[in-house]
Amino acid sequence: MTADDGGAVPGPDGRPRCPWGLSADDYIAYHDDEWGRAVHGDDALFERLCLEAFQSGLSWITILRRREGFRTAFAGFRIAEVARFTDADAVRLLADPGIIRNRAKIDATLANARLLAEWPEGELDRFIWSYAPDPATRPAPRTLSDVPAVTDASTALSKALKKRGLRFIGPTTAYALMQACGLVDDHLSDCFARGAG
């Protein structure tokens, strides 16, 4: 997101939305139906973790428009299946035009799946959600400039995930994950989706 001096902006249907959520039809649907809504389940959180890592250095719309390609390429982000991917699968992924073909990000995804496959069922969900800050301590942002890129909680989550062996999850990526999965509600105070998580 970029800084902006205004609040929510009316969309095509007249409902006020965060300004970033109006730049493309894909963004409108993502903003309205997904971003900031609670995501639970190890595989669902693994998908979001992977997509946020692939987004690093790119625009989110690039990832959003390739999400189905990612889901197909990475076996629906089912941790147990991705953990069994071989070197041949890595080569296949590097040739797949439906995803971002970045060797470091692909390798990190496969390594993270192998590591997470060893965790007890539900552990990733519990672990990530244990870093959700108390909503009462976070005022609703009025403008996009009020929305941070990194917080103490995202820095702590990033460090904790790295300590447990996960790769490609810095504090900014961790905060984007927290926003996308509803750990924090960064919809603007006058956005219709505020509090829908």
Language model regions located:
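HhH-family (HhH-GPD) DNA N-glycosylase catalytic core used in base-excision repair
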Residues: 1-197
